[in-house]
Amino acid sequence: MYLVDMTFTDMTKITPELTDKHKNYLEGEYKSNNLLFGGRKVPRTGGILISQHASKRELEQVLNSDPFIKSGAVTYSITEFIPLMASKAYQGIVA
């Protein structure tokens, strides 16, 4: 599993139109269950995604095609982790 930390690097590029393109692009990844969660950081300096893509390379390919990344408005870092504990609602994803 992966935690993706996205950071805004150019707020002037973060328009409602670009944000809609980003959300629409990622929608397919949620439908295929590759992305589990995503949302804004507080304060709004970027966002976080929780991914269960098959590999880091596959996740990187998805991220590099994201309109946020392609526009140069956002950078990202990926941390791989193994979930060992979860609430009852999420026991199915714990190793």
Where are these regions (language model features)?
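Conserved, structured core segments of small domains
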Residues: 1-95
